[in-house]
Amino acid sequence: MSKPLKQIHLAAHFPGVNNTTVWSDPRAGSHVEFSSFAQFARTAERAKFDFLFLAEGLRLREQGGKIYDLDVVGRPDTFTVLAALAAVTEHLGLTGTINSTFNEPYEVARQFASLDHLSGGRSAWNVVTSWDAFTGENFRRGGFLPQEERYSRAKEFLATANELFDSWHGDEILADQETGTFLRDAKAGAFVHTGQHFDIHGQFNVPRSPQGRPVVFQAGDSEEGREFAASEADAIFSRHATLETGQAFYTDVKNRLAKYGRRHDQLLILPAATFTLADTDAEAEELAKVVRRQQVSGATAIKHLEFVWNRDLSSYDPDGPLPDIDPDVGDNHISKGRAQVRMYRDPLATAREWRELAAANNWSIRELVIETGNRQNFIGSADTIARTINELVQADASDGFILVPHITPGGLDEFADKVVPLLQERGVFRTEYEGPTLRHQLGLAHPDDVPGEQRVAS
């Protein structure tokens, strides 16, 4: 007997501070004005997507001592945008990336509980940590933590926030107009938490929200990040969008759940994925090449090499050969605030590999960056992309995808109009929303209904 088809989850990532965005395209809109966010969210909701996802950047990146201005620079506050979007959408989940290294549990819990009320139960929290002192300077001098301590703090941060969410049970508000009694229990919201990172006590001032707690996402790919996701998260935002790497990641993380008393269906794996859509596969391949050349200008290619070489390469011609000099293997002093710096842990080996590739293919600096960088995950006609997405989900390489269009706010429209109907015809994607909350859309139980989720505050 064949197993039933898995239902696909789809989300929309409003792109910003990353090299997937072609902000200079004439069709691109603002990354700050609310109209762009609203249009993007309405398209996602029209297509019956599960949620909208906002990333976060806590400091403007620098390169060579100057603001890195080849990508989008600056963005509005995440909570402000999500609260505004709650007013112009009805079903779409609202996921915000909020840092656990530089915030406090009470403040963040208050913001998410408020967003959950305002949206009718559609809030989600992507819990992240920060690894660099450069970003920390915006918050406190010398402000960063070693990796182990970052995840220790993140775990306690989330546990503390959950205590605050659970300090209200949901039945405390009586609001009896005849007797003038508003609260059934004067101890509502009382909490006491004493731990390694937080020592707080008081009363939480936001009543229990529709979801009880926001849906929790985690985006780390390290060993610590995978364990954190397996023990705490409802969904994990990953970068593994191919069959082989996706299945390996999916199996690894799902197999960690048992040690925490959790089932496989209690954690969703949702890789980020870019796409290029055209009428035919051949046209899509050509369009993908155009998009990559838009994303990698000559100046961008030189800056990309500087991440690895850790040197000022501004005098080099992007249409010329790679530098003969070796990378500076000391502390990176060229690029600051860029996670990509950590992707090349052995710059000498990376430079050697790139020189060999460039020599074998007669590539210039720009051609090398175009060919070795991130190409679109899904390239093809609507039918090809729908088939590919479905095959990956049914093969347990993912539970769905967080789609990242290269143009905002209109870059999602064609996917919504052409790919989504094909997935619906295959019976693997909803035609209507399942219920009022994001937990309903994702098939996740309410915290009150999950065994072992006892409340620890009273």
Whereabouts are the PLM-identified features?
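Conserved, mostly hydrophobic/aromatic
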Residues: 10, 44, 48, 85, ...
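A structural motif
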Residues: 49, 120, 233, 397-398
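Short, acidic/polar
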Residues: 31-44, 218-229, 381-394
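Hydrophobic, small-residue-rich alpha-helical packing segments that form membrane-like cores
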Residues: 3, 9-19, 23-35, 77, ...
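An alpha-helical appendage that flanks or caps ligand/catalytic pockets
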Residues: 2-16, 148-211, 244-248, 255-393, ...
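N-terminal beta1-alpha1-beta2 module of alpha/beta enzyme domains
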Residues: 2-88, 211-214, 328, 436, ...
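Alpha-helix-loop-beta-strand connector modules within alpha/beta enzyme cores
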Residues: 67-94, 259-260, 415-431
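Hydrophobic faces of well-ordered beta-strands that scaffold small-molecule active sites
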Residues: 8-12, 52-54, 92-96, 123-127, ...
